[in-house]
């Protein structure tokens, strides 16, 4: 029974193929891109009519095989390998009746197909663990769709479920295009997929498979996902595929030297999705691909090398393809060109002995498909023996041998002696110039929006507003330019071609200037420590001599006739300089008293000062901000034998002066001047006067947008030890400490200056403090 059912289903595939067109064209290209949820899209391109494929899935090994009836393969590379967790390799093969694509997977998978224009999109994702249901029940439960219905609906999706395990033994014994038993469902309808499933299908397939949304619905999910993918095609071109779900507009594309910058306006990229791909090893014009966030926009930067040209396509909303091709040889260029040439024509072999040059040109025209027109001046014979040489290189060799050159217009190539072509070019240019000199003059007003009209005076090299003449290369000898500063308008009078050049120039230059927010942080930290130890002591007394009384001692004035009074004055006076805690001892003795005082001090200080000036300015425009004091100083001037006194104001400010310069690759070069001045007290002789403590920085540095750079710093450390003592007495061990004063001081100061520039968006950003 199962064998009969297998034959019936195989017959249905044959019937389906019979209803399709006898010749459906060739497969010309295969591209792979990524979707969220670990999905892949394989895009198969055709040169003619599209055929919806039939196929089957195996789990061991994990493969998806798709057959395209009455289809050939027209690709230089028929085996494509990928370093991907799901898809590892795509192999293409053909026989007389069909073409087959085999998708080798790293793990079991499932797929859906969809026809879009001249392409078939194959959506691949991982299969659930419970998908491997028995093959026989799946065959019985799957109703076969009529062949006519399949052929008449090329734009519908077809779903293929898991068939019998395709063992390696069966694979080796089977012919290259032997069909396996598959379960074919009805044409795919996302709205009716669950309702149309039978009870047996629900038992064989898990609930997850029924609830799975098709790839198209997943692509339209509201969650914004952005991803990039890179690959190389058969033309040595680098292909970058950008998937930006949720972005419905068109990207802004600009070219700056060796960079292609693609900007998605108002499409925010999460920080975790920023990435950079180094693809230089692929040997394409693309060297590096960077996806990053720029304010509220997403920016794709393609770094290139060599000569290239860009082709961009939009496959669907949110999906963009950028193809960077090596630039082909320009056949229209004439004259001497020492640059290395690249030849891409079909290889041919020629072996002639003493043959007319015209005959050789005729053969090359047939081989290349070009229409070659030779001048009457082209004549002579030559011997030529070439094997497996591109036809365009053979043509170049013939022209070099006979001093010939060519000019191409469409599919027609004119070949003549080089001098003859140069004379024609010169005559043509002279005729165009004569026509321009005799043409009518027109007047056009250009009111500038963002630039100052005076800036165009220097661009056009106009000394005054009504200057005429041909000193400027943009203006013809009969033209003139007037400038109206009141209305910011340029009035151009010249031929139509010159006015059109002015229009293009103004469109390129009259654009809003980028703005930069520059933020500086000045951090000043100080750490101080000091310790002092001092001593002072003295003695006083009174002694009676006969009938007289004489006073003696340290600390009182000696005299005669004094009373029995006691007093004390320190004669060893070595205290600490600062006010501090002290211990004083007085000891009375029979004839006087001793006084001893010990003083000690220790201090620890830590300070931190933060200054944060910031300023907003346009690109290449200087900005300045200051905050502080103006301190008056008295200045005495002496002249002609007399003197005069004046009062001058000196600034003590915290200031930031900066001029930013944005480079084409988004870096910022800044010329920075930072001042941090403050009033201070300075010693001048025996006086203390007012002075200004200054800290200045002048530098030029480059930093990336949003990056922070330390542009300067100063570190100071002062260490001091002082010792004051009484000679000789201070040197006595132990007791000598009573005749000493010690001091220790350590001060550390550090100044660091940070600077952070940020390029503001065109709409402007609010300042945040």
Curated annotation (Swiss-Prot):
Outcome, altering residue 428 to F = In strain: CCUG 37602
Q: What is its main location?
A: membrane
Q: Which Gene3D superfamilies match?
A: 2.60.40.3470, 2.60.40.3500, 3.30.1370.120, 3.30.1370.130
What is one Pfam family matched by this protein?
A: STN
Q: Name one process (GO BP) from the record.
A: protein secretion
- GO terms for CC? cell outer membrane
Consequence of changing residue 475 to V? In strain: CCUG 37602
Composition-biased stretches, type Low complexity, lie in 135-154, 197-225
Q: Which UniProt keywords apply?
A: Cell outer membrane, Competence, Membrane, Protein transport, Signal, Transport
Q: What else is known?
A: Present in outer membrane vesicle formulations which are used as vaccines in human.
Q: What is this protein called?
A: Type IV pilus biogenesis and competence protein PilQ
Tell me the organism.
Neisseria meningitidis serogroup B (strain ATCC BAA-335 / MC58)
Lineage of the source organism?
Bacteria, Pseudomonadati, Pseudomonadota, Betaproteobacteria, Neisseriales
């Amino acid at each position: 029974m199962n064998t009969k059912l297998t034959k019936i289903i195989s017959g249905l595939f044959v019937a389906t193929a019979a209803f399709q067109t006898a010749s459906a064209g060739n497969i010309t290209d295969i591209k792979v891109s990524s979707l969220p949820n670990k999905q892949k899209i394989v895009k198969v391109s055709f040169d003619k009519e599209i055929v919806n494929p039939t196929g089957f899935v195996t789990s061991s090994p994990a493969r998806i095989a798709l057959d395209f009836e009455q289809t050939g393969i027209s690709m230089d590379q028929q085996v494509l390998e990928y370093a991907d967790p799901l898809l590892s390799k795509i192999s293409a093969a053909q026989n007389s009746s069909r073409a087959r694509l085999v998708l080798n997977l790293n793990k079991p998978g499932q797929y859906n197909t969809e026809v879009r224009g001249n392409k078939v999109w194959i959506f691949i994702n991982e299969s659930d663990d419970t998908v491997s249901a028995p093959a026989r029940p799946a065959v019985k439960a799957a109703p076969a769709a009529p062949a006519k219905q399949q052929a008449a609906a090329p734009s519908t999706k077809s779903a293929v479920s898991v068939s019998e395990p395709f063992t390696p033994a069966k694979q080796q014994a089977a012919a290259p295009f032997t069909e396996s038993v598959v379960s074919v469902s009805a044409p795919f309808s996302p709205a009716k997929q669950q309702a149309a499933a039978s009870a047996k299908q629900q038992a064989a397939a898990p609930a997850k498979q029924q609830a799975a949304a098709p790839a198209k619905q997943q692509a339209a999910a509201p969650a914004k996902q952005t991803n990039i993918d890179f690959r190389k095609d058969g033309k040595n071109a680098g292909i970058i595929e950008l998937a930006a779900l949720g972005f419905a507009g068109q990207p802004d594309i600009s070219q700056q030297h060796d960079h292609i910058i693609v900007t998605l306006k108002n499409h925010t990229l999460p920080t975790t999705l920023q990435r950079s791909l180094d693809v230089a090893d692929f040997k394409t014009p693309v060297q590096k691909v960077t996806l990053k966030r720029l304010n509220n926009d997403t920016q794709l930067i393609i770094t290139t090398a060599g000569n290239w040209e860009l082709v961009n396509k939009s496959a669907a909303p949110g999906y963009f393809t950028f193809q960077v091709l090596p630039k082909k040889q320009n056949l229209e260029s004439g004259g001497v060109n020492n640059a290395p040439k690249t030849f891409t024509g079909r290889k041919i072999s020629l072996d002639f002995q003493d043959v007319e040059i015209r005959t050789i040109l005729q053969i090359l025209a047939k081989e290349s498909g070009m229409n070659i027109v030779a001048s009457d001046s082209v004549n002579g014979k030559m011997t030529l023996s070439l094997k497996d040489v591109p036809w365009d290189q053979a043509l170049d060799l013939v022209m070099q041998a006979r001093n010939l050159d060519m000019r191409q217009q469409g599919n027609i190539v004119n070949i003549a002696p080089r001098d003859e072509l140069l004379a024609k070019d010169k005559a043509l240019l002279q005729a165009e110039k004569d026509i321009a000199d005799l043409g009518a003059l027109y007047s056009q007003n250009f009111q500038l929006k963002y630039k100052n009209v005076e800036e165009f005076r220097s661009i056009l090299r106009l000394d005054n507003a009504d200057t005429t003449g041909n000193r400027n290369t943009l203006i013809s000898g009969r033209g003139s330019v007037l400038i109206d500063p009141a209305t910011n308008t340029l009035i151009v009078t010249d031929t139509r071609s010159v006015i059109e050049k002015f229009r293009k120039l103004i469109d390129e230059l009259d654009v809003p200037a980028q703005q930069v927010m520059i933020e500086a942080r000045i951090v000043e930290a100080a750490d101080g420590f000091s310790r002092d130890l001092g001593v002072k002591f003295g003695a006083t007394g009174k002694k009676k001599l006969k009938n007289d009384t004489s006073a003696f001692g340290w600390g009182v004035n000696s005299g005669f006739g004094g009373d029995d009074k006691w007093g004390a004055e320190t004669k060893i006076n070595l205290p600490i300089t600062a006010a501090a805690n002290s211990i004083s001892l007085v000891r009375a003795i029979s004839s006087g008293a001793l006084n001893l005082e010990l003083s000690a001090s220790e201090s620890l200080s830590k300070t931190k000062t933060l200054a944060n000036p910031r300023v907003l300015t346009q690109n290449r425009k200087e900005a300045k901000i200051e905050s502080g004091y103006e301190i008056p100083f008295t200045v005495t001037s002496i002249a002609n034998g007399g003197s005069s006194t004046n009062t001058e104001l000196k600034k003590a400010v915290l200031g930031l002066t900066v001029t930013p310069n944005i480079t084409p690759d988004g870096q910022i070069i800044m010329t920075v001047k930072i001042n941090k001045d403050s009033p201070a007290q300075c010693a001048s002789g025996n006086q203390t006067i007012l002075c200004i403590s200054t800290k200045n920085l002048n530098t030029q540095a480059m930093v990336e947008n949003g990056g922070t750079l330390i542009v300067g710093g100063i570190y100071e450390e002062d260490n001091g030890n002082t010792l004051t003592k009484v000679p000789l007495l201070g040197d006595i061990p132990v007791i000598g400490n009573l005749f000493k004063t010690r001091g220790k001081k350590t001060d550390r100061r550090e100044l660091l200056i940070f600077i952070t520039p940020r390029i503001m968006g065109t709409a402007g950003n609010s300042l945040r403090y």
